UniProtKB/Swiss-Prot annotation:
Residues 121-136 are annotated as: J segment. Residues 21-116 are annotated as: V segment. InterPro entries: Ig-like_dom, Ig-like_dom_sf, Ig-like_fold, Ig_sub, Ig_V-set, TCR_variable_domain. Residues 1-20 form the signal peptide. Residues 117-120 are annotated as: D segment. Keywords: Adaptive immunity, Disulfide bond, Immunity, Immunoglobulin domain, Receptor, Signal, T cell receptor. This is T-cell receptor beta chain V region E1.
Amino acid sequence: MWQFCILCLCVLMASVATDPTVTLLEQNPRWRLVPRGQAVNLRCILKNSQYPWMSWYQQDLQKQLQWLFTLRSPRDKEVKSLPGADYLATRVTDTELRLQVANMSQGRTLYCTCSATGGLNTGQLYFGEGSKLTVL
């Protein structure tokens, strides 16, 4: 029986150690207090070039997840205004994606993702740790 437990532990450790989501994205800041009317800049760094499509998603206070942007090439930019916030996404380099959030009226959490393909069939999405923004 103890051999089975050791085998299970080894399999669990191997799956954690080889989990690609651990090192695919670095997102910051992790949280920020934002005075009403002030803009905040978020940054996402891609750690693995096999997943070149980078996106931003927002999650509102009701935990609803909503896609915002997907950008592939350096210097790509997109702007979007939604109830509660205005967004400007910029693909700075092959490995860096930025998001400026302005005119926030309520808090939200923003997630950077990466995937191997773009379009409607993105395949597996890998999420960053999230940036929780709280409006003062």
